[in-house]
Amino acid sequence: MTHSFAVPRSVEWKETAITILNQQKLPDETEYLELTTKEDVFDAIVTLKVRGAPAIGITAAFGLALAAKDIETDNVTEFRRRLEDIKQYLNSSRPTAINLSWALERLSHSVENAISVNEAKTNLVHEAIQIQVEDEETCRLIGQNALQLFKKGDRIMTICNAGSIATSRYGTALAPFYLAKQKDLGLHIYACETRPVLQGSRLTAWELMQGGIDVTLITDSMAAHTMKEKQISAVIVGADRIAKNGDTANKIGTYGLAILANAFDIPFFVAAPLSTFDTKVKCGADIPIEERDPEEVRQISGVRTAPSNVPVFNPAFDITPHDLISGIITEKGIMTGNYEEEIEQLFKGEKVH
């Protein structure tokens, strides 16, 4: 189900290339890039030209299918061996978002029973496209489930960009706002700018304005004052990886928002698809946290804002403990109780709230 949608797609398959919206150029320029090699795909993910856990997974899946076309062998076993090398290479691009390895693993499984190299290559393309199609419906369902938590006129805060351009369509944390717009529910979102790479100001503010959704931009340090003065009703964020107990890795600054929400007695929600859960990881302490280039902190958009040699600590993500999370919204329902128990039920196919 797709409605008229003003926000462009972040990733598209073109048979001989992958077209991505270059998110590094936003909001000043809407530029599309063609990725034709596995190196192009790796670079696009590492340099944040494409970002957002689901979009990274989709891009990597397309990248594996694309690179597989260049594997020259008639031996299926040899084909799978070379495919595994490419998979490991792409999987090393970013360590925190579990959707990346989930999508690549799913493509690997799609060739297990292939009896020829041609069949394997075809299976890879079909599976990658299917991941994107499923993600759009998943995001719509997340939005639909999240919408029941809000009422007309609510003011809701978010951080980073868990929107349409971070997924195949709609987004996770931003999905309810697109659906609310269709139903004229008048939700208003306060977007934290999200230092150091400014995904909130460059991406979330841009895409919500493209979609005609009411948005107000604030700096990260304004969050507490805004919660108090603007009577924020709730906080909703996306996720890059969710542990077995509900601990959640998301963009740096998310943990701080959760602490503030708890202090103001404001519900704090996480919105994520099942593909973001890592049931092999017991708790947040076991999730690897990517550290990025110090220059991201020393400058903004190429303009130096700090001494060139000042030491920098630049983790891209933080971990929000499960006990600060009021609910985890998925395509299968909303979890609000014992996360470890409910996550286990979810993966057994049982219904949650």
UniProtKB/Swiss-Prot annotation:
The keyword Hydrolase does not apply. It is an enzyme of class 5 (isomerase). Its EC number is 5.3.1.23. Optimum pH is 8.1. GO terms for biological process: L-methionine salvage from methylthioadenosine. Keywords: Amino-acid biosynthesis, Isomerase, Methionine biosynthesis. InterPro entries: IF-2B-related, IF-M1Pi, IF_2B-like_C, Initiation_fac_2B_a/b/d, M1Pi_N, NagB/RpiA_transferase-like. One of its GO terms (molecular function) is S-methyl-5-thioribose-1-phosphate isomerase activity. The record marks C160 as: Transition state stabilizer. Pathway: Amino-acid biosynthesis; L-methionine biosynthesis via salvage pathway; L-methionine from S-methyl-5-thio-alpha-D-ribose 1-phosphate: step 1/6. SUPFAM superfamilies: NagB/RpiA/CoA transferase-like. Signal peptide: none annotated. The active site is at D240 (proton donor). It catalyses: 5-(methylsulfanyl)-alpha-D-ribose 1-phosphate = 5-(methylsulfanyl)-D-ribulose 1-phosphate. Catalyzes the interconversion of methylthioribose-1-phosphate (MTR-1-P) into methylthioribulose-1-phosphate (MTRu-1-P). Belongs to the eIF-2B alpha/beta/delta subunits family. MtnA subfamily. NCBIfam families: eIF-2B_rel, PRK05720.1, salvage_mtnA. Homodimer. This is Methylthioribose-1-phosphate isomerase. It comes from Bacillus subtilis (strain 168).
